[in-house]
Amino acid sequence: MNTFEKIYEQVKKIPYGKVATYGQIAAMAGNPRWSQIVGYALHVNPDPKNIKCYRVVNRFGELSDNFAFGGKSAQEQLLESEGITVEDGKVDLKIYGAFL
């Protein structure tokens, strides 16, 4: 399994209505220093219907300005459709964090 496949497998583990950070996904995929690689892998996500990359946020709970599948507003809409509250472009990780 290559690095991107490892990342995609971890993203698939984020439950409905929850989020994870790039760093958490990196650590779960095998290397906590892969945060930027996680971001790149999600940007080229080959299967966004099954690999829910919109559930990944930064360490502060902030949405991505460069969300590859419609921008920040699309990411916000997708998260809100799962019942996740987004305020000022941020998600409360204490409430919605999957792996805290």
Which stretches of residues belong to each language-model region?
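Nucleic acid-binding interface residues in structured DNA/RNA-binding domains
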Residues: 1-100
